[in-house]
């Protein structure tokens, strides 16, 4: 049987740190939680640059782990 996939949630945050290989540390606006995130494939393909201090939209995986930056605001 096929189970329903859990919905992914998205939050807005600010980039606080940049690491090699398009990894970033993002602090969410609602909570004071910091998470490790990576760039989505389309953002890598179009070479969209993310700088420290940028507001970004992050998609959070319901199973934990890293978040994915899907939009620069």
Predicted region positions:
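Exposed beta-strand/loop interface patches that mediate assembly or binding
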Residues: 1-73
């Amino acid at each position: 049987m096929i189970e329903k996939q859990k919905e992914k949630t998205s939050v807005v945050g600010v980039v606080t740190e940049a690491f090699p290989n398009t990894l970033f540390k993002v602090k969410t606006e609602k909570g004071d939680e910091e998470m490790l995130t990576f760039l989505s494939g389309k953002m890598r393909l179009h070479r969209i640059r993310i700088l420290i201090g940028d507001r970004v939209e992050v998609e959070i995986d319901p199973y934990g782990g890293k978040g994915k930056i899907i939009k620069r605001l």
